[in-house]
Swiss-Prot record:
Listed HAMAP family: PyrG
PROSITE patterns named among the record's database cross-references: GATASE_TYPE_1 (PS51273)
Annotated GO CC locations: cytosol
Origin species: Methanosphaera stadtmanae (strain ATCC 43021 / DSM 3091 / JCM 11832 / MCB-3)
Sequence ranges assigned to domain Glutamine amidotransferase type-1 in this UniProt record: 294-532
Gene this chain is encoded by: pyrG
InterPro entries in alphabetical order: Class_I_gatase-like, CTP_synthase, CTP_synthase_N, GATASE, GATase1_CTP_Synthase, P-loop_NTPase
Name of this protein: CTP synthase
Residues at which Mg(2+) binds: 71, 141
Chain positions recorded as CTP binding sites: 13, 148-150, 188-193, 224
Length: 534
């Protein structure tokens, strides 16, 4: 039987509920507990696939092809697990399921209401994940802030969940923010008190309060919060701003979060001590300041780093694996893009994206890397930019993608045939994990040390097979394909120190303890370039 830890948030949004959930999960995993995680997003969208990255950040893709909230990326990286798309519950999914059941007559003529039908569906979705994963503990993060009208059905559902599962099988962790007023030189606990009061007014008494803050809170402040929020002082946990998000599990473990939760939920473990040695080593490796490599991410949505959060984290993982510090600069690939700015970098990365804006800047960045032997890594749209650049530099100046010019006379990149028949936008791309066959003697093979891999995809466009010969005659190496050789999955370039583009998204499979092979190889190449310049 699974036990549930529900994480709610108060005071402000983006407070760190996802990192808190992931950190608690990491701590429990280090005790040998089987943990999974769920993210509840209280928006009416069915999934994250059509959301603006400027507003919502990265769209994370699971193996089973669900477009999800970026917090699932935190869960997978911290817990080192592969989650199902069912781990992302949205209001859209809940209402769609309830309406479908109503149309089928499954409610036997009842007046369908928020309570009990919507709340029952929410609980069913949570329990289905628990049953499928056989997890001992299920982390359930409720998105938004306590008091939001959108979150109310979910708050009511998890309140009911605790009553039905029992006190020993469900607990609540409330994440709040304790602001520091520099003028007064003091912390203010009133927002935390009011947020907890709001939660208790909805029928939920938190078992633990996690206080986010810029600086560390002293014992007197913790005692004050414990007194006014009616929790034991040992259940008031402070997580001040850290050098790295990967430090948070260590901070929480040092505050005895693990033992408190194990006792609160009556969980028996094979050991009384968590094994966080490997995690501690990762944190130390991430603190390395020298040697240093500079990487430019030439992208479209660079104003919000969360739009490329998995790429950022993957670069950090690869830096730790190569014992170097990775300095990341975010370069906007717009019309006024100055190519000379790239001279200072040891490597370039062209991330995925959609639409024409910024594509010319990305193509020019690829050409710069080709002409100057700079290591360059292209992901999804990055592979498209690489293919177009190779063609343009080798006698096909009009090379383009039909994504940007439907009437292109040299469509090196074209929409996949099966995609041309699709009208709906959401959930209709080539999504999820697909196998890839790697050619021996290539950079890809050197990185993976395998000829058969699986990676996650999110795209509608591919290299046009009619232009394969043109690309290979220009020095391109097709180093990865679908098992039937029909789809180009990876491309490299002869006589270049490190030039690799992939149609898939390797950033979704990188872990702090297992840097993705391609990112690891890319950073190694950037490190070599810097060393050879000395």
């Amino acid at each position: 039987m699974s036990k549930y830890i529900v994480v709610t948030g108060g005071v402000v949004s983006s407070i760190g509920k996802g990192i808190t959930s992931a950190s608690i999960g990491r701590i429990l995993r280090s005790y040998g507990v089987n943990v999974t995680a769920i993210k509840i997003d209280p928006y009416l969208n069915w999934d994250s696939g059509t959301l603006n990255p400027y507003q919502h950040g990265e769209v994370y893709v699971t193996d089973d092809g669900m477009e999800c909230d970026l917090d699932l990326g935190h869960y997978e990286r911290f817990l080192d697990v592969e989650l199902s798309g069912k781990a992302n519950i949205t209001t859209g999914k809940v209402y769609s399921s309830v309406i479908e059941k109503e149309r089928k007559g499954e409610y036997l003529g009842s007046c369908v209401q928020i309570i009990p039908h919507i709340t029952d569906e929410i609980k069913l979705m949570i329990r289905n994940v628990a049953e499928k994963t056989k997890a001992e503990v299920v982390m359930v993060e409720v998105g938004g802030t306590v008091g939001d009208i959108e979150s109310q059905p979910f708050i009511e559902a998890v309140r009911q969940l605790k009553n039905e599962e029992g006190h020993d099988n469900c607990m609540f962790v409330h994440v709040t923010y304790v602001p520091y007023l520099k003028a007064a030189k003091e912390f203010k606990t009133k927002p935390t008190q009011h947020s907890t009061k709001e939660l208790r007014g909805l029928g939920i008494n938190p078992d633990m309060i996690v206080c986010r803050s810029e600086l560390s809170l002293d014992a007197n402040l913790k005692e004050k919060i414990a007194h006014f929020c009616d929790v034991p002082i040992e259940a008031v946990i402070n997580t001040p701003d850290a050098h790295s998000i990967y430090e948070v599990p260590l901070i929480m473990y040092s505050a005895n979060v693990g033992s408190y939760i194990l006792n609160r939920l009556n969980i028996d473990t094979a050991t009384n001590k968590a094994d966080l040695y490997e995690w501690s080593q990762i944190v130390e490796d991430l603190k390395i300041e020298t040697p240093k490599v500079k990487i430019a991410v030439v992208g479209k949505y660079i104003e919000l780093e969360d739009a490329y959060i998995s790429i950022r984290e993957s670069l950090k993982h690869a830096g730790a694996a190569n014992k170097v510090h990775v300095d990341i600069d975010w370069i906007k690939a717009d019309n006024d893009f100055n190519i000379d700015i790239l001279k200072q970098y040891d490597g370039l990365l062209i991330p995925g994206g959609f639409g024409e804006r910024g594509i010319n800047g990305k193509i020019e960045a690829v050409k710069y890397a080709i002409k100057n032997n700079v290591p360059i890594f292209g992901i999804c749209l990055g592979l498209h930019a690489m293919s177009i650049a190779i063609a343009q530099l080798n006698g096909y100046p009009d090379a383009n993608s039909t994504e940007f010019d439907e009437n292109s006379t040299c469509p090196v990149i074209d929409m996949m045939e099966e995609q041309k028949k699709i009208n709906n936008m959401g959930g209709t791309m080539r999504l999820g994990a697909y196998p890839c066959k790697i050619k021996e003697g290539t950079l890809a093979y050197e990185a993976y040390k395998d000829t058969n891999i699986s990676e996650r995809h999110r795209h509608r466009y591919e290299v046009n097979n009619e232009y394969r010969d043109i690309l290979t005659s220009a020095g391109a190496i097709i180093s990865g394909t679908s098992p039937d050789d029909f789809l180009v999955e990876m491309i490299e370039l002869e006589n270049h120190p490190w030039f690799l583009g992939c149609q898939f998204h390797p950033e979704f499979k990188s872990r702090p303890n297992k840097a993705h092979p391609l990112f690891k190889s890319f950073i190694k190449a950037a490190k070599n370039k810097k060393q050879n310049q000395k």
